[in-house]
Amino acid sequence: MFVTKRIGPKSKDLGKIKKLYEEAFPENERFSFSMMIKNESGHYETFGFYKDGAFCGFAIVLNSLDISHIIYFATLPEMRGKGLGAKALAAMGRIESGRRIIVDIEREVPDCEENEIRRRRKNFYLRNGYSETEVRYRWQDEAYEILVFGGKLSKEDFGNFWKNLGINKNTSEG
């Protein structure tokens, strides 16, 4: 059975989540793990995913206005390719019902050796009900695009999401 749990700062699984977070995301793409888990701003939510009682992945979501932005999403390497990512996204859709859910993915760029994995990642989200948007931006010298579930998303919506959090996000094509 697949289960999704909200994770708080005293969860027994924080060590597993932090380990996967550090393994799955390069250091230059990571925020302060403790800041997100403590959630003093009230904008972060952390979810753990479990298959038959065993931890298999997590998502960290940043909420603003009517948008839930999955900023980190990972499953254990040995659990990939088993449909658990799709189950996790479906669970997120139920939990965040009535809100638009967005993800950012690295865009394909000419002569990039990671284009195949970027294409597969994008197709994974599209197969799971996400749609393309007009939103493109650059961060840490990387080109990103936004996909959305549960509605549409404009550049203005994306800018307002960040503005509401007190952050000025440049959505130029870059």
Describe the function of each predicted region.
Residues 66, 139-143:
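Short acidic/glycine-enriched loop/turn segments that link adjacent beta-strands
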